[in-house]
Amino acid sequence: MSPKSSGILKGHFLMAIPGLPDPNFAQTVTCICEHNKTGALGFIINRIHPLLTGQELFEDLKITCNQAIDKIAIHLGGPVQPSGVFVLHGPPFDWHGCLKINDWLGLSNTRDILEAVARQEGPENFIVLLGCAGWGPLQLDNEINDNAWLTIPVSQEILFKTDVKLKWEMTMMQMGIVSDNHSDNSGKA
């Protein structure tokens, strides 16, 4: 049973279809962390804050940080709770309130993981995000049925290792879609 037909997209990427008119999500890759009858929660993983540095973020949070943390990118996770700070990360998963998404991916947003990341003592693989994306009951299911999104299982390589500018293109290529050969129109067969 596919995620589309079962309604369970936790642990999947959502890729905006080529030509999606919503500027909040055009050419985005979103990691879905929760999807159930009450709605869905996800994080855009291919948009970087143009001005905010890691050091500035942690100083704003009054968290002491290692100077090298300034080199990490701060991702724009979505238009909901834009000042909320979240961490998508690999093991360990023993942070307060960690939501384990699959065997190798968790979501946390408590001070313990933020302090560990700031000191470079946290998980080996992580991305720091501001804000999230949210959908109400059946909203995401309806958008998928209306062909606004494509889905594939989350990939460690794309999430943690691929250049942010290439993530949308790489996920589309995994589906066999080459960005030069697509239509900006969607529909149903």
Swiss-Prot record:
GO terms for cellular component: cytosol. InterPro entries: AlgH-like. Pfam families: DUF179. It comes from the Bacteria. Gene3D superfamilies: VC0467-like. Belongs to the UPF0301 (AlgH) family. PANTHER family: UNCHARACTERIZED PROTEIN YQGE, UPF0301 PROTEIN YQGE. This is UPF0301 protein HRM2_24640. It comes from Desulforapulum autotrophicum (strain ATCC 43914 / DSM 3382 / VKM B-1955 / HRM2) (Desulfobacterium autotrophicum). The lineage of its organism: Bacteria, Pseudomonadati, Thermodesulfobacteriota, Desulfobacteria, Desulfobacterales.
